[in-house]
Amino acid sequence: MKALLYTGIGQLELKDVPEPSSDFIVKVLGCGICGTDLKTYQKGHHLFSPPAILGHEFYGLVEKAPIGCGYLAGDKVVVAPYAECGFCDVCIRGAGSLCANKHYVEGGAFCEKVGIASDYIEQGVFHIKELDDVYTLVEPLACVLNGFEQLDLKPTSRALVVGAGPMGALFALLFRAKGIPVGVVEPSAQRREKIASWGIEAFEPGGAGHVESPRAGRMESALTGQVESARPSRVEKGFYDIAIIAVNKKELVSEYIKFVADAGTVLMFSGLSSDEIVAIDAYSIHYRQVSLKGSFGYALRHFKEALSLIEAHKEMFLKIITHNYPLELGKEAFEMLASGEALKIVLRP
């Protein structure tokens, strides 16, 4: 079968590789390029030694299935890239995203077919209604839902998302859908225009300029139907009580701890390397009761909730996907994503 192989930093090659020998095989119809894929391509990654097949945000058709597993050849499915064990201490405490005994899909999905272990089918494979690239967003949205779970959202909450990459954009869409006033800080004018076209206020870093949303002012929640309060026309210190850091720059964490309102929350969503140290404003933590929280990955409950949300609000989430490429143009797709011109790219075998 054809596969897009990561063969070294800055190197991707379309190669013939052996087909999976599993009893359960999914024919891949689409797989999203995630931030980890891009980072691996640009800088390498300790978990992916070349040659390796990257990609884990995929959906497709069941090509082969064991009798009695609940699936038949031709079934439409989306696959969770991993599942927690459900029995360890962190799982029992409800933090399945941190499980040390996760079960993983066998190999990446930038290829024509993916094999699924028999003992993973019940946990990690899910029926879907139709074949659509929107299902590549289930895993990213699951991670965002885990982030939401770390927040103490109130009817009066106001959120600022720092970074309008695909994950930041998902945060912004979900805040808006829940009726929570939200703004986005993003240096790319093209991405600000995109965000603004969705009715979300988008600002340049520093707050000097912004793009007027066509629906600036009061807005209606897509999920509740309630009309919520207006957004500001500029980024104002102390206005937002929630700041989502969706860019992996440690200085932004330090900056927004000082920026959020009293009793506000800063969520570190984008990961930093293990050797990076973040400077914390102790005054804000103690005297202003600002909370700093982190969010990593998802638990299966988030994946299931994300799937339900996407099937209920398909058109809203499809806005995230801006480009698709055939697998043979995978290197061009990665370069497009690196340029910042695309938001979310799907590769199709």
Residues covered by each model-derived region:
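Glycine-rich beta-strand-centered segment in the early N-terminal region that forms part
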Residues: 20-31, 45-87, 120, 126-129
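N-terminal glycine-rich cofactor-binding segment
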Residues: 3-20, 33-63, 78, 92-105
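Adenosine-nucleotide cofactor-binding segment
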Residues: 161-164, 176-255
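C-terminal hydrophobic helical "lid"/dimerization subdomain
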Residues: 209, 254, 300-349
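NAD(P)H dinucleotide-binding glycine-rich loop of Rossmann-like/cofactor-binding domains
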Residues: 85-162
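Glycine-rich phosphate-binding loop and adjacent beta-alpha segment
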Residues: 250-312, 349
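Mid-domain Rossmann-like dinucleotide-binding core that forms the NAD(H)/NADP(H) cofactor-binding site
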Residues: 74, 130-204
